[in-house]
Amino acid sequence: MIGKNLSNPIPEWAEHGADREVVPYTVATDMDAPNPDSGEEWFHTNTQLFNVLDAQNRFKGAEEVTEPWNAPPTNATPTMDGFVSDYISTFTAEIGRQPTYEEYAHIMTGYTPEQLPVLSAIARDFGVFDRWFSEVPSQTFMNRSFWTAATSSGIVVNSPVSKRLTKNDAETIFERLEQHGKTWKVYVMEPMSLSFHGIIHYPRLKDRLATNFVAFAEFERDAAAGTLPDFSLIEPTSSPATATTTRHSGAHSAVPST
């Protein structure tokens, strides 16, 4: 980002700062930015990437957004200039007032390598995806499902969770492993008591919840004893009520923990 002179336009309907016309990219000064969280669902992604925000969807919460879902024209090229527009709308829907310029400018901030030494070291010394494509440009659970089942069974938003218990019935990588005589476990880091993958794939894996989804302490024992299964998947702690062990940062993220 540094040195690229990036910015996003300020929509004319913004109550504060519209006379500035654009919000330039700047270095973040707050580790809790933006707050509240930016829009995650796929119709927010439409606005963020194409700067299309249907008038009836402006300032609407996720459950109130309607067709055509801020969809861009067919074959449109992403302009990447709708992050400010979407954040002003999302902030207003959640807080009940439009944000000040200083509040919505947070959406155009990022961190330097010096501010994030651990992540920077990992990026410098190991493989990094610099062209990553989300199977569903939406929230976490659908992309977790694609990771382990290559589909989300047509589900495109997280809520309601009840959909996971009945509709996401696609075959999983875990079942394929069993078909080839391979063993597997999902190790869930404490204090989380439930596995996200167990919930996401409940229709297919409900009979394995008691045997193949275990606490992370068991991973430590298996590793020490040399008895790890053929396939191990570790779910880091991502509870908003405790310190996290992943960049997922509690409940406020749209990407899977890895």
Language model regions located:
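N-terminal pro-sequences and low-complexity stem/linker regions of secreted or lumenal proteins
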Residues: 1-258
